[in-house]
Amino acid sequence: MTDIQIAQAAKKENIVEIAKKLGLTEDDIEQYGKYKAKVNLDVLQKNKRPNGKLILVTAITPTPAGEGKSTVTIGLTQALNKMGKLSAAAIREPSLGPVFGMKGGAAGGGYAQVVPMEDINLHFTGDMHAIGIAHNLISACIDNHINSGNALGIDVTKITWKRVVDMNDRALRNIVIGLGGKANGYPRQDSFQITVGSEIMAILCLSNSITELKEKIKNIVIGTSVTGKLIKVGDFHIEGAVAALLKDAIKPNLVQTLENTPVFIHGGPFANIAHGCNSILATKMALKLTDYVVTEAGFAADLGAEKFIDIKCRLGGLKPDCAVIVATVRALEHHGKGDLKAGLENLDKHIDNIKNKYKLPLVVAINKFITDTDEQINMIEKFCNERGAEVSLCEVWAKGGEGGIDLAEKVLKAIDNNKTEFDYFYDINLTIKEKIEKICKEIYGADGVIFAPATKKVFDVIEAEGLNKLPVCMSKTQKSISDNPALLGKPTGFKVTINDLRLAVGAGFVIAMAGDIIDMPGLPKKPSAEVIDIDENGVISGLF
């Protein structure tokens, strides 16, 4: 059966029953039909139980198809519950654009999925819509201000705030707005990005309360004035209205796995130009309600795990207790250009980063495919053992929670035996430039960093505005540990080039652009939209 057929055949429990497993009452949730709910934020204040343990699922450098982080995340939480450990997953909401583009649906796979799959992949509870409208309200107010006399003196050539839509549409990357005379606004160049790339999305995921959300929105930089002054959303006095649009979106969403175990799905920031993790609030809520929370970070350990630790955990006051590195034979052979042994060097770098840079206990999860041979599995296991890394053959795609029992046992053992004290990778008091250099040299293995001339002006602004104590959000290719997608495996002898710096002051970080990162994807020649359908009974097919 396909993933969607497996999901549709699942026996789902009413969301009230899932909430009860977490100790929640009907008054604690707002139901969106029978199988979805939002959880009220006061649950965090009312619940006094100690926090559970936080498990991060990351991966080796992925192939375009992905290596199954979400599947392993869901399978691991199913396995923990099967062992009698109260556990929940905390993951991101998929973006509509990739659903209709190349990727198709995204809610795990096989017998390690989250349901209702169709709802999660389409409109879900409306959070993406709310984030898009909130973002575009700012856009509308910027152009209205310019058309109404431009009292702030906004330099229309230096507006950095784009518009958003939750769709892959390359035709919107570069546009001209305000055509047709003065009644239609001031003509200028503009562009769209996909909604998950919005700073509003990052802010929603990094806010601990409505009050903090509003303050972060107020601090968003949308451009500069003709005199070089930073223009912020607070200058338009609209932060209250923008936050009001997000009053429901800020509440975490509760759903379930195929095995009726709880899952929080909330937020979905881009793993490149943002931090690529689900919301702080959903993670904190899961930690407060369960003994073990399994979460994931976008792309590989060089990108997602670093930002999870240095951005999400730092801003949310979170402490991970263990990391799982997902590896596949397919991806390792890809990095070795067909040679599995050579490709293991990629895994080696990620193990080193997790153990020695992030200082976390770890387990390598080999996400098993039916084409994998015993010889290949044995080679990976031997490699991990030689490096002092626990390893587990993970079969959650085929067997659900049962296929993740060994992984769950080894994760619990790693947590119980951990003697190291968690700390962030870099000192927040380093300058932005020093943080970038530390990440590039130590996490990526670069010989050095080249800063393009365009970055000098931004560094000057960072210094003048006192922004050096913000964390750094690295934006680079996910296809390589380096900034060059062609360098596979464990690259050496390279330098990272930082082409540009972007100020995400509202979210609370500075984005370092290494290479050309597209924030508005396009559809492939044959998009997934061509195979998605709905019958007369409302049954959807082709999502995955």
From Swiss-Prot:
InterPro entries: Formate_THF_ligase, Formate_THF_ligase_CS, P-loop_NTPase. It catalyses: (6S)-5,6,7,8-tetrahydrofolate + formate + ATP = (6R)-10-formyltetrahydrofolate + ADP + phosphate. The keyword Ligase applies. Gene3D superfamilies: Domain 2, N(10)-formyltetrahydrofolate synthetase, Formyltetrahydrofolate synthetase, domain 3, P-loop containing nucleotide triphosphate hydrolases. ATP binds at residues 63-70. The keyword Cell inner membrane does not apply. Pathway: One-carbon metabolism; tetrahydrofolate interconversion. GO terms for biological process: tetrahydrofolate interconversion. This is Formate--tetrahydrofolate ligase. The lineage of its organism: Bacteria, Fusobacteriati, Fusobacteriota, Fusobacteriia, Fusobacteriales.
